Amino acid sequence: MMGRIFLALALVWGTWTLPAQAAEERAAQMGALFEALDLEQTVEIMHEEGLRYGAQIASDMMPDADMDSWNATIARIYDAERMSGLVRREVTARMDGAQIAPLTTFFASDLGGRIVALELAARRSFLQDGMEETAQDALGAAQRQNLPVLEQIEGLISDSDLIERNVMGALNSNLMFYRGLVDGGASDLGEADILADVWEQENAVREDTDTWLRGFLLIAYQPLSEGDIEAYAALYRSAPGRALNAALFAGFNQMYEELSYLLGRAVAEHVTSAPL
């Protein structure tokens, strides 16, 4: 009798440990992919962008704000560790069932590592004043010379639906900022009014996104050969690449929506607590 009980317990334990082991293996695979993508450096740059954006918000909406207090608030909102955690959780969930190994193999290769480094360097360079204008000048020069890289950039944009995904992400972030303002008591706009205001921004957001994205991609990928860019494009045309693209957008959009809401709440709190 005791033998049967032991056997039953062993079977139950076995059925419990298999999913746990699979989850641990999956987590390790995703950890390796995040490392190959250098996610922490990406988030660190976004953290710096957030600090700058917070300062701009203060200048535009709260010129008389206590900047020491506001800067401390912005630093708490754009906490890099929390930002990374948000992205990791969402991307990991979205990649459930997708092939991870081919992605890690590519991004851990010499070419993949170089592409990641070029993308990060380009994004960090855009933190410098005047860099966006420099990128647009470079884009104009490339267009006049009809450089082959431009056609490949168009292919990357089209294959991964980069403009539409970025536009929708930006609009959703703006929506969450409005909701933060309302929930914080700084605005009495209803949901219909908020949605109307956000949709009015669509054309401007789309134009800005198109301009920024093409300049950024040119700066990032111009050092690569046509063959290198084609190999990268082929990765994102594959099933694992499409899954990663969708998961990354979902992860970063989730992060930005939460940050935007918190930023709206923070603005509301500072505005409503300001002395008359």
Spans of features found by a protein language model:
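N-terminal mature-domain "stem" immediately C-terminal to a signal peptide or N-terminal signal-anchor/transmembrane
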Residues: 22-61
